[in-house]
Amino acid sequence: IIGADECDAAGMLLPHNYIGRISDGMPNLWAFLNSDADSEARQSGAQGGAALEYRLHVHAPLRRGSMFCQLSGIRALGNKTQNMAHVVIDETAGRCAATAEAVGVAMDLTTRKAVLISAERRQRLEQLMIR
C-alpha cells in the first residue's frame, strides 16, 4: 500500500519511489531465479549486483493508499548483462500503473567488476525468460 510519505502534495507516488518499490521486490525475483551457488555467493558477500540503466514509464500514477502488485522477469541476456522487465499493477484501480526496464549485472565485490554469466546460470535463466 502506498504511504503518504512516498507521495507529493497531490497524493501521487513520487518517481523515485516507483524504482524503490521495484527494487524492494528484487530479492523475491532473485530467490526464484538464482541457483543455490548464486545464492551462496551473494549471501557470503563475494557477489552482488548493480543496475546499469533504468527506464521507468508511468502510465497511470499510483496514489496514496493504492494497493499494487509487481510482476518481474528476465527479457534478454548478454555476456554479462541481464535485461529485466517490471510491470506495476494498481490493484485498487485495476490497471497498469507503470512499466520499467533495467539492465543489470552480477558483480565480483572483491575486484569490483562485472562477471560473466556462467553456463549454468545462463541455461537456467533462458528457461525462465519472458517470451
Regions found by a protein language model. Name each.
Residues 1-53, 105-131:
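Hot-dog-fold acyl-thioester-processing enzymes
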Residues 40-64, 68, 73:
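Structured core of small recognition/catalytic domains
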Residues 58-67, 74-131:
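HotDog/MaoC-like acyl-thioester-processing domains
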